[in-house]
Structures are given as C-alpha cells and as structure tokens.
C-alpha cells in the first residue's frame, strides 16, 4: 500500500509539473514588428491592448513604409487575443482598429495596408499579421519570401528572382500567383554559385500573373551581404499614388 501511495504521489507531482510548464510556455510573449503601408495615411501611433496587456504597448510616429522596431528586431507583445489600434501621430484620431491573435513565442510581421480615407471607421484598412517561420538557410544559400501588400496592384502577381546578370524573367516562376494580402513560402538560392570575386546578387521581377513581358511592376536588384541572409520583400503601393510601388520594401529576418 505504501509503495502504491508513493507511486501515485509521484505521478500526481509529475502531472502538476507538466501542467505548470505548459502554462508557463503558453504565456511566453509573441515577437512583433510593425510596417505602416497605408498609402493615404500620415504617420501613425500604434496601441496594443488586451486582457494580457498590463500597460498599452506602442509603436510611435511610424511614417509610410516605416518599420518598428529598427531592423533586424522585434518587440515583445503579450500572446493571446489583443486589439491593435492605429492613430494619427500625436492625436486621438483613430485610423483603424482590429483584433489579432498572437501565438506564444511566435514572431510576426504585422502590416497595415489598404486605404484610410475611404470607407467608414477604417473599414478599408487591412491588417496583416503574418507568422515569421524564419528558416536557417542551407550552407552557402540565402532565402527570400514575398508579401503582397499592394491594394492598387494586380490581385495576383508572379515573382521571378534571377541571378545577375539577368536579361529578364525566365521560367520557372519563382513564386506563382501570389494574391493580395498573402505571403509566399521562403525560397532558397545559392549566394555565389560561380565563386565570383564580388557576389552578383539577384534581380527581382514582379509581373502580372502569367506574363513575362514588360513593363514589369518591379524590376529591382537585391544584394544580400552574405550567405545565410534571410529577407522578406514587401510589395506596397506608392504613397498617394494608387499604383504598385516600383520598389519593394526589404526586411531583414533574423533566425
């Protein structure tokens, strides 16, 4: 009987420890970076509030295509369900309000896009909360992914990433049929496959889906500094232009 009670006590203690550890793990903060891509909005202050937020978390005075915190970096936010609000900087004028759900210990790129001057109460602002499942590239490689956050661009685009020197996009398509508000998977490329003295970099082409003909929405080089680099390329609008920007916004993804 004594041995049985001892075994039951041990099992109960282990169960309590397991529940406690799971509870602690579930309370680990999320890691968030914020991008202001609302093409018709002035600089923003961002407030995050919710049941797990003890004091309002803020990103402040973010201009169009601004990123906070400085790259590469994230800000710790309580995991779980929260409310995120955008205000014109230094005012109580609300531009948008939306709910988010952030997983424990997960990294996110949060992008506010769409339009602020049409629709009621920020109804035409779109908030993207995209998990950053950042890979460790294979030895000698770099990795890219693309987020389509351009409301004035095509509904879907094809993305070609070509080693320099490049004369234009060629098959196969690197990222095919990327829809507005969606993020691609990461794609791996050899950093310097020909062992050039100066690594050649790449050219990124963004086209309408199914087309390889100019004019391209984007035709821009990118030069990662070293093998092992991981980058997110965000497609956005031109400020007040109602057209896709001819340059992508480059984010550095730490792993």
Regions found by a protein language model. Give the residues of each.
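Bacterial N-terminal signal peptides that target proteins for export
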Residues: 1-10
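C-terminal motif of bacterial Sec signal peptides marking the signal peptidase cleavage site
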Residues: 19-23
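Intrinsically disordered, low-complexity polar regions and short flexible loop motifs
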Residues: 24-255
């Amino acid at each position: 009987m004594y041995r049985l009670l001892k075994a039951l006590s041990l099992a109960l203690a282990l169960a309590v420890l397991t529940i406690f550890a799971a509870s602690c793990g579930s309370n680990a903060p999320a890691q968030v970076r914020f991008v202001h891509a609302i093409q018709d909005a002035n600089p923003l202050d961002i407030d995050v509030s919710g049941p797990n937020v003890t004091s309002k978390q803020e990103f402040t005075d973010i201009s169009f295509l601004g990123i906070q915190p400085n790259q590469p970096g994230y800000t710790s936010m309580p995991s779980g369900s929260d409310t995120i609000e955008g205000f014109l900087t230094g005012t109580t004028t609300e531009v948008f309000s939306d709910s988010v759900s952030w997983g424990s210990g997960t990294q996110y790129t949060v992008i506010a896009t769409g339009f602020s001057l049409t629709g009621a109460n920020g109804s035409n602002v779109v908030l993207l909360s995209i998990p950053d499942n950042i890979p460790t590239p294979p030895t000698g490689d770099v990795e890219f992914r693309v987020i389509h956050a351009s409301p004035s661009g095509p509904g879907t685009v094809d993305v070609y990433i070509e080693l320099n020197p490049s004369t234009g996009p060629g098959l196969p398509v690197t990222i095919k049929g990327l829809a507005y508000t969606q993020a691609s998977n990461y794609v791996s490329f050899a950093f310097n496959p020909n062992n050039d003295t100066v690594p050649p970099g790449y050219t990124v082409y963004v086209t309408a889906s199914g087309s390889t003909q100019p004019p391209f929405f984007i035709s821009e080089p990118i030069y990662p500094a070293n093998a092992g680099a991981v980058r997110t390329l965000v497609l956005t609008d031109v400020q007040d232009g109602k057209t896709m920007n001819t340059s992508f916004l480059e984010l550095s993804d730490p792993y």
